[in-house]
From Swiss-Prot:
Lineage: Bacteria, Pseudomonadati, Pseudomonadota, Gammaproteobacteria, Enterobacterales
Induction behaviour: By heat shock.
Job of this protein: ATPase subunit of a proteasome-like degradation complex; this subunit has chaperone activity. The binding of ATP and its subsequent hydrolysis by HslU are essential for unfolding of protein substrates subsequently hydrolyzed by HslV. HslU recognizes the N-terminal part of its protein substrates and unfolds these before they are guided to HslV for hydrolysis.
GO MF assignments: ATP binding; ATP hydrolysis activity; peptidase activity; proteasome-activating activity
Native source species: Shigella dysenteriae serotype 1 (strain Sd197)
Protein name as it appears in the record: ATP-dependent protease ATPase subunit HslU
Length: 443
């Protein structure tokens, strides 16, 4: 689990997301509170429940990006789901309990990677011994059994030294490795994913673990042997329990597009993919026990972060019980021209940096001037205002149109320097931006 302070979390998010300070602060505090809770005594820790967050803001302002970046920072089980993919229990489609099952699967993978990393040093030693056994087979007695030598032979030590120095990396050897499990693809109807995964694991376990002789270079064999030996050192039952504990104590669920499951107007039929989903979400958010293939998981202390544009619906259109379970409201602001300018230049891997790197592979040096950046930002903002406001995503559309000619001719422009200034942008975009009909379909 991450031990970063709220200030450090916000600072890390600032490297990728421009503006939206309130949302960053709320998420940072919620993440830090997970750590604070774990420092309490067990009795009080059980009483402290997470304060779930509802992020409200137009499309393209950074709601989903905050979730993506948070997943990398949290060092805790985190899953992002779309609210529109679920239906009420009993109808065709995924039920909301599958959120917790997927979160537990993600936790098992995360804990397994950590356990393998922890045992890597020992796994490297065992892998090294197996390769040395192939290069210099151990001595055998009259009954064909391997004799245990007190001290490794001089030849074995010499080969060990060469192996560690990489002198034998390209030498080919034949070695026995665990055969890949039998793959069985099962097509199941929506909502039956749990049964499908259980059937697949059952088929994979048929016939036990088989060994298969493979001819590989030593450097490739070493990688596979390290993975195999590390997996043997991991206790599966302990791993499952650690994963369930991680989900229950540190799990985070990010539910996107929650505004799309709000009830709109009066309808006579059953609303299985809107209000029905909200009702099914209630016990998860409030706290219940969900059955997964790894064991029973309690959701009492899982943090839920929901987000939605709420352009048609309003937060008050959510059923009152769900509103009460999302006590922290954060409003994200629409982006301005200056925000667009910062998005084009400040993030670590901004769009302009990406385009420059892509063109550099063809030997073309692209330079964006300040005036060019400003004009691109103005064009994107202008199109957003005159057509549909899709936030920062408009920058991708505008830049792709601007760079189309250079991208097409890049292989013929090798060694050239191209400067993209205000005049260049105006020449290529002004006609499109000014014509509302054209910009509606092209930008």
């Amino acid at each position: 689990m991450s031990e970063m302070t709220p200030r450090e979390i916000v600072s890390e998010l600032d490297k990728h997301i421009i503006g939206q300070d309130n949302a960053k602060r709320s998420v940072a505090i919620a993440l830090r509170n997970r750590w604070r809770r774990m420092q309490l005594n067990e009795e009080l820790r059980h009483e402290v429940t997470p304060k779930n967050i509802l992020m409200i803001g137009p499309t393209g302002v950074g709601k989903t990006e905050i979730a993506r970046r948070l997943a990398k920072l949290a060092n805790a089980p985190l899953i992002k789901v779309e609210a529109t993919k679920f239906t009420e229990v009993g109808y065709v489609g995924k039920e909301v309990d599958s959120i917790i099952r997927d979160l537990t699967d993600a936790a098992v993978k995360m804990v397994r990677v950590q356990a393998i990393e922890k045992n890597r040093y020992r796994a490297e030693e065992l892998a090294e011994e197996r390769i040395l056994d192939v290069l210099i087979p151990p001595a055998k007695n009259n009954w064909g059994q391997t004799e245990q030598q007190q001290e490794p032979s001089a030849a074995r030590q010499a080969f060990r030294k060469k192996l560690r120095e990489g002198q034998l990396d390209d030498k080919e050897i034949e070695i026995d490795l665990a055969a890949a499990p039998m793959g069985v693809e099962i097509m199941a109807p929506p909502g039956m994913e749990e049964m499908t995964s259980q059937l697949q694991s059952m088929f994979q376990n048929l016939g036990g673990q088989k060994q298969k002789a493979r001819k590989l270079k030593i450097k490739d064999a070493m990688k596979l042997l390290i993975e195999e030996e590390a997996a043997k050192l991991v206790n599966p039952e302990e791993l499952k329990q650690d994963a369930i504990d991680a989900v229950e104590q540190h799990g985070i669920v990010f539910i996107d597009e929650i505004d799309k499951i709000c009830k709109r107007g009066e309808s006579s039929g059953p609303d299985v993919s809107r209000e029905g989903v909200q009702r099914d979400l209630l016990p998860l958010v409030e706290g219940c026990t969900v059955s997964t293939k790894h064991g029973m998981v309690k959701t009492d202390h899982i943090l839920f972060i929901a987000s939605g544009a709420f352009q048609i619906a309003k937060p008050s259109d959510l059923i009152p019980e769900l509103q009460g379970r999302l006590p922290i409201r954060v409003e994200l602001q629409a982006l301005t021209t200056s925000d667009f300018e910062r998005i084009l230049t400040e993030p670590n891997a901004s769009i302009t940096v990406q385009y420059k790197a892509l063109m550099a592979t063809e030997g073309v040096n692209i330079e964006f001037t300040d005036s060019g950046i400003k004009r691109i930002a103005e064009a994107a903002w202008q199109v957003n205002e005159s057509t549909e406001n899709i936030g920062a995503r408009r920058l991708h559309t505008v830049l792709e149109r601007l760079m189309e000619e250079i991208s097409y001719d890049a292989s013929d422009l090798s060694g050239q320097n191209i400067t993209i200034d205000a005049d260049y942008v105006s020449k290529h975009l002004d006609a499109l931006v000014a014509d509302e009909d054209l910009s509606r379909f092209i930008l």
